[in-house]
Amino acid sequence: GITNMQEIKDDYYDGERPLYGIHDTKLINTTFGKGESPLKETANLALDGVLFTWKYPLWYSDQITVTDTIFEEMSRSGIWYTNDIEITNSTIQAPKEFRRCDGITLDNVHFSDAEETMWSCKNIKMHDVYANGDYLGMNSENIYVDHLDLVGNYVFDGAKNVEVHNSRLVSKDAFWNCENVTIYDSKISGEYLAWNTKNITFINCTIESDQGLCYVDHLTMKNCRTLRTDLAFELCSNIDAEIKGSIMSIKNPISGQIKVDHVDEIIMDDPKIDQSKIKIIQNDQG
């Protein structure tokens, strides 16, 4: 809670570990200059208008709220082994933020370099997040996303239990090696979507993916569009897909049903596949 919190205001710190281990403290309009690990091993902090300019600002910390704060480019690897952190209305210029954290809530946060960000974390909520960079969210789990605008490849590689709403992802190799993903009302553009993933569902989505949706087990699509998508569904099993409009080509799916308005080309040339287990229904063919 916020009761009995001491306050640090309009201050400046540099050097190594200047506020090591502080707790139950509000930091307002405070800048951390050159010096590693300024807030290591801290707990129950409320940061407002803080500027971090150097490495490892929040390691091994618990119960941190952050508002209107800037993590500059050199505040890299900034938030590791930290639990229950909430960041609102803030800008993160540094890569490699968040590693092995439990309990991350982001609201109106801009990552200008999201490379290797949020790896091996769990219990994540993101709302109104703008991110640019490769490998966001790798091997993380229990993720709820609403309005993520991402430009960056390999998003959520190896993630588990992911729910995405109202998002726009420009990402090749998105959702590889995942388990239990549901995506609603979103646009995804980028080749090789969701390979090697188990249990992925797309509802009201627009997908543009060269060789997308291959090697998936349990793929569900409801009211989706596949713009410029070819060689889809290769070696995909347990498909339940309902696609509006057309798809360029479908290649060697293993099992399930695909309903689509029109397919330009169906390629079934893999002798290992029992074609009686797959049904492709084209609405324009009655």
Residue ranges of model-derived segments:
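Long, distal/terminal scaffolding or interaction modules
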Residues: 2-286
